[in-house]
Protein backbone atom coordinates (compact mmCIF):
# COMPACT_ATOMS: atom_id res chain seq x y z
CA UNK A 1 0.00 0.00 0.00
CA UNK A 2 1.25 3.48 -0.88
CA UNK A 3 0.46 5.88 1.93
CA UNK A 4 -0.62 9.15 0.26
CA UNK A 5 0.80 11.66 2.77
CA UNK A 6 4.39 12.61 3.60
CA UNK A 7 4.99 15.14 6.37
CA UNK A 8 8.79 15.49 6.22
CA UNK A 9 10.76 16.73 3.19
CA UNK A 10 13.68 19.05 2.50
CA UNK A 11 14.40 21.14 -0.59
CA UNK A 12 17.48 22.86 -1.98
CA UNK A 13 16.69 25.69 0.44
CA UNK A 14 18.45 23.44 2.98
CA UNK A 15 21.71 23.22 1.07
CA UNK A 16 22.45 19.62 2.04
CA UNK A 17 19.28 18.61 0.17
CA UNK A 18 19.02 18.33 -3.58
CA UNK A 19 15.49 18.79 -4.94
CA UNK A 20 13.07 21.60 -5.67
CA UNK A 21 9.35 21.87 -4.99
CA UNK A 22 8.84 21.10 -8.69
CA UNK A 23 10.87 17.90 -8.31
CA UNK A 24 8.73 16.80 -5.37
CA UNK A 25 5.53 17.52 -7.26
CA UNK A 26 6.71 15.41 -10.20
CA UNK A 27 7.60 12.45 -7.96
CA UNK A 28 4.37 12.85 -6.00
CA UNK A 29 2.40 12.49 -9.23
CA UNK A 30 4.38 9.36 -10.16
CA UNK A 31 3.92 7.71 -6.76
CA UNK A 32 0.36 8.71 -5.96
CA UNK A 33 1.29 11.04 -3.10
CA UNK A 34 -1.66 13.39 -2.64
CA UNK A 35 -0.30 15.69 0.07
CA UNK A 36 3.21 16.50 1.27
CA UNK A 37 4.76 19.05 3.59
CA UNK A 38 7.82 21.07 2.70
CA UNK A 39 9.72 21.28 5.99
CA UNK A 40 13.18 22.74 5.56
CA UNK A 41 15.48 23.03 8.54
CA UNK A 42 14.92 25.87 10.99
CA UNK A 43 17.22 28.90 10.78
CA UNK A 44 19.49 27.87 13.67
CA UNK A 45 21.07 25.21 11.43
CA UNK A 46 24.20 26.42 9.67
CA UNK A 47 22.97 25.72 6.13
CA UNK A 48 19.27 26.34 6.75
CA UNK A 49 17.28 28.89 4.79
CA UNK A 50 16.85 32.41 6.09
CA UNK A 51 13.93 33.19 8.41
CA UNK A 52 12.21 34.92 5.50
CA UNK A 53 12.05 31.65 3.57
CA UNK A 54 9.43 30.40 6.00
CA UNK A 55 7.58 33.72 6.11
CA UNK A 56 7.27 33.68 2.31
CA UNK A 57 6.04 30.09 1.99
CA UNK A 58 2.64 31.75 1.57
CA UNK A 59 3.49 32.20 -2.14
CA UNK A 60 3.28 28.44 -2.68
CA UNK A 61 0.03 27.32 -4.32
CA UNK A 62 -2.21 25.10 -2.25
CA UNK A 63 -2.45 22.42 -4.92
CA UNK A 64 -0.65 21.68 -8.18
CA UNK A 65 -1.94 18.99 -10.55
CA UNK A 66 -3.90 17.33 -7.77
CA UNK A 67 -1.06 17.34 -5.23
CA UNK A 68 -1.51 19.42 -2.07
CA UNK A 69 1.38 21.30 -0.48
CA UNK A 70 1.68 22.03 3.24
CA UNK A 71 3.85 24.97 4.26
CA UNK A 72 6.03 23.91 7.15
CA UNK A 73 9.32 23.76 8.98
CA UNK A 74 11.49 21.24 10.77
CA UNK A 75 12.47 23.48 13.65
CA UNK A 76 15.32 22.77 16.03
CA UNK A 77 14.78 22.07 19.71
CA UNK A 78 17.40 24.43 21.10
CA UNK A 79 17.66 23.78 24.81
CA UNK A 80 16.38 22.00 27.90
CA UNK A 81 13.41 24.38 28.03
CA UNK A 82 12.19 22.96 24.73
CA UNK A 83 12.43 26.25 22.86
CA UNK A 84 12.51 26.11 19.06
CA UNK A 85 14.12 28.40 16.49
CA UNK A 86 10.92 29.75 14.94
CA UNK A 87 8.55 31.83 16.99
CA UNK A 88 5.86 34.43 17.48
CA UNK A 89 3.06 35.20 15.07
CA UNK A 90 5.06 33.62 12.24
CA UNK A 91 4.29 30.17 13.64
CA UNK A 92 0.58 30.69 13.05
CA UNK A 93 1.25 31.29 9.35
CA UNK A 94 2.61 27.77 8.92
CA UNK A 95 0.43 24.72 8.30
CA UNK A 96 2.68 22.28 10.14
CA UNK A 97 5.56 22.53 12.62
CA UNK A 98 7.98 19.67 13.09
CA UNK A 99 10.80 19.82 15.63
CA UNK A 100 13.66 17.62 16.69
CA UNK A 101 17.21 17.42 17.93
CA UNK A 102 20.09 18.19 15.57
CA UNK A 103 23.71 17.99 16.68
CA UNK A 104 24.86 21.41 15.36
CA UNK A 105 22.15 23.17 17.41
CA UNK A 106 21.70 20.99 20.51
CA UNK A 107 24.72 18.72 21.07
CA UNK A 108 23.88 15.34 22.63
CA UNK A 109 23.87 15.40 26.42
CA UNK A 110 22.25 12.87 28.76
CA UNK A 111 18.95 11.02 28.92
CA UNK A 112 17.39 13.31 31.53
CA UNK A 113 18.27 16.45 29.56
CA UNK A 114 17.00 15.05 26.27
CA UNK A 115 13.77 13.86 27.86
CA UNK A 116 13.08 17.16 29.58
CA UNK A 117 13.79 19.15 26.41
CA UNK A 118 11.56 16.95 24.26
CA UNK A 119 8.69 16.94 26.73
CA UNK A 120 8.92 20.72 27.12
CA UNK A 121 8.74 21.09 23.34
CA UNK A 122 5.67 18.85 23.34
CA UNK A 123 4.04 20.85 26.14
CA UNK A 124 4.80 24.20 24.47
CA UNK A 125 1.88 23.92 22.05
CA UNK A 126 4.15 25.06 19.22
CA UNK A 127 5.15 21.67 17.82
CA UNK A 128 2.86 19.27 15.95
CA UNK A 129 5.29 16.42 15.30
CA UNK A 130 8.51 15.37 17.04
CA UNK A 131 10.99 14.22 14.41
CA UNK A 132 13.25 11.17 14.73
CA UNK A 133 12.75 10.70 18.49
CA UNK A 134 14.40 7.29 18.13
CA UNK A 135 17.82 8.77 17.37
CA UNK A 136 20.28 6.71 19.48
CA UNK A 137 22.51 9.77 19.89
CA UNK A 138 19.75 11.29 22.04
CA UNK A 139 18.48 8.64 24.47
CA UNK A 140 15.14 9.53 26.06
CA UNK A 141 12.67 8.12 28.55
CA UNK A 142 10.43 6.68 25.85
CA UNK A 143 7.38 6.03 28.03
CA UNK A 144 7.49 9.55 29.49
CA UNK A 145 7.75 11.11 26.03
CA UNK A 146 4.96 8.93 24.62
CA UNK A 147 2.73 9.78 27.58
CA UNK A 148 3.33 13.50 27.07
CA UNK A 149 2.68 13.19 23.34
CA UNK A 150 -0.61 11.43 24.04
CA UNK A 151 -1.65 14.00 26.64
CA UNK A 152 -0.84 17.05 24.51
CA UNK A 153 -1.92 15.68 21.14
CA UNK A 154 1.50 15.78 19.51
CA UNK A 155 2.51 13.10 17.00
CA UNK A 156 5.72 11.09 17.20
CA UNK A 157 7.54 10.32 13.98
CA UNK A 158 8.91 7.00 12.85
CA UNK A 159 11.58 8.35 10.52
CA UNK A 160 12.31 6.14 7.53
CA UNK A 161 15.63 7.83 6.81
CA UNK A 162 16.88 6.72 10.23
CA UNK A 163 17.10 3.16 8.92
CA UNK A 164 18.76 3.97 5.62
CA UNK A 165 21.15 6.93 5.50
CA UNK A 166 21.45 8.46 8.98
CA UNK A 167 20.97 7.84 12.72
CA UNK A 168 22.15 4.24 12.44
CA UNK A 169 20.96 1.98 15.23
CA UNK A 170 17.51 3.56 15.53
CA UNK A 171 15.53 0.33 15.07
CA UNK A 172 15.31 -0.72 18.72
CA UNK A 173 14.34 2.76 19.91
CA UNK A 174 11.75 3.21 17.18
CA UNK A 175 10.22 -0.16 17.97
CA UNK A 176 10.00 0.83 21.64
CA UNK A 177 8.45 4.18 20.68
CA UNK A 178 5.84 2.47 18.49
CA UNK A 179 4.99 0.04 21.31
CA UNK A 180 4.69 2.86 23.85
CA UNK A 181 2.55 4.90 21.47
CA UNK A 182 0.21 1.95 21.02
CA UNK A 183 -0.06 1.31 24.76
CA UNK A 184 -0.44 4.96 25.79
CA UNK A 185 -2.60 6.19 22.91
CA UNK A 186 -0.10 8.47 21.20
CA UNK A 187 -0.36 9.33 17.52
CA UNK A 188 2.32 8.14 15.10
CA UNK A 189 3.30 9.45 11.69
CA UNK A 190 5.80 8.11 9.20
CA UNK A 191 8.22 10.63 7.71
CA UNK A 192 10.45 9.98 4.73
CA UNK A 193 12.76 12.83 5.77
CA UNK A 194 13.55 13.13 2.08
CA UNK A 195 16.59 15.17 1.14
CA UNK A 196 16.06 14.23 -2.51
CA UNK A 197 12.67 13.85 -4.16
CA UNK A 198 13.20 10.23 -5.18
CA UNK A 199 12.61 9.12 -1.57
CA UNK A 200 9.31 10.99 -1.18
CA UNK A 201 6.73 8.65 0.31
CA UNK A 202 9.34 6.01 1.09
CA UNK A 203 8.09 4.38 4.28
CA UNK A 204 9.00 0.70 3.91
CA UNK A 205 11.31 0.42 6.91
CA UNK A 206 9.15 2.63 9.14
CA UNK A 207 6.04 0.68 8.19
CA UNK A 208 7.70 -2.63 9.04
CA UNK A 209 8.24 -1.41 12.60
CA UNK A 210 4.68 -0.14 12.91
CA UNK A 211 3.35 -3.45 11.64
CA UNK A 212 5.65 -5.45 13.91
CA UNK A 213 4.09 -3.90 17.03
CA UNK A 214 0.57 -3.99 15.54
CA UNK A 215 0.08 -0.24 15.91
CA UNK A 216 -3.44 0.60 14.67
CA UNK A 217 -3.10 1.89 11.13
CA UNK A 218 -6.31 3.87 11.47
CA UNK A 219 -4.36 6.16 13.82
CA UNK A 220 -1.48 6.77 11.41
CA UNK A 221 -1.56 10.34 10.12
CA UNK A 222 -0.29 9.19 6.72
CA UNK A 223 -3.45 7.20 6.03
CA UNK A 224 -5.20 10.05 4.18
CA UNK A 225 -4.88 13.79 3.51
CA UNK A 226 -7.95 14.53 5.64
CA UNK A 227 -6.55 12.55 8.57
CA UNK A 228 -3.56 14.88 8.66
CA UNK A 229 -5.55 18.03 7.93
CA UNK A 230 -8.04 17.26 10.70
CA UNK A 231 -5.16 16.66 13.11
CA UNK A 232 -3.58 20.00 12.19
CA UNK A 233 -6.90 21.83 12.43
CA UNK A 234 -7.47 20.39 15.89
CA UNK A 235 -4.04 21.70 16.85
CA UNK A 236 -5.08 25.21 15.87
CA UNK A 237 -3.70 25.60 12.35
CA UNK A 238 -6.47 27.69 10.83
CA UNK A 239 -4.56 27.92 7.56
CA UNK A 240 -5.31 24.30 6.63
CA UNK A 241 -8.95 25.27 6.12
CA UNK A 242 -7.81 26.41 2.66
CA UNK A 243 -6.81 22.85 1.81
CA UNK A 244 -9.74 20.96 3.25
CA UNK A 245 -12.21 21.67 0.42
CA UNK A 246 -9.64 20.38 -2.06
CA UNK A 247 -9.86 16.96 -0.41
CA UNK A 248 -13.61 16.97 0.18
CA UNK A 249 -13.91 13.53 -1.44
CA UNK A 250 -11.37 12.07 0.98
CA UNK A 251 -12.23 9.72 3.84
CA UNK A 252 -10.27 10.52 6.98
UniProtKB/Swiss-Prot annotation:
**So where does Zn(2+) 1 get bound?**
8, 10, 74, 193
Residues bound to Zn(2+) 2: 16, 41, 195
Task: Tell me which GO cellular component terms the UniProt record holds.
Answer: cytosol
Could you tell me what the cofactor note in this record states? Binds 3 Zn(2+) ions per subunit.
The reply to whether Iron-sulfur figures as a keyword in the UniProt entry is no
UniProt keywords, alphabetically: Hydrolase, Metal-binding, Zinc
Checking Pfam families in the record gives: PHP
- Binding, Zn(2+) 3: 74, 102, 132
Name the Enzyme Commission number(s) assigned to this protein. 3.1.3.-
SUPFAM superfamilies (alphabetical): PHP domain-like
Uppermost EC category: hydrolase
Q: Which InterPro entries match?
A: Phosphatase_YcdX_put, PHP_dom, PHP_phosphatase, Pol/His_phosphatase_N, Pol/histidinol_Pase-like
BP GO terms, sorted: bacterial-type flagellum-dependent swarming motility
Its cofactor is: Zn(2+)
One of the record's GO molecular function terms: zinc ion binding
**Hey, which family's this protein in?**
Belongs to the PHP family.
Q: HAMAP family under this entry?
A: YcdX_phosphat (MF_01561)
What is the official name of this protein in its record? Probable phosphatase Shewmr4_2619
> Per the UniProt entry, what species is this protein from, by scientific name?
Shewanella sp. (strain MR-4)
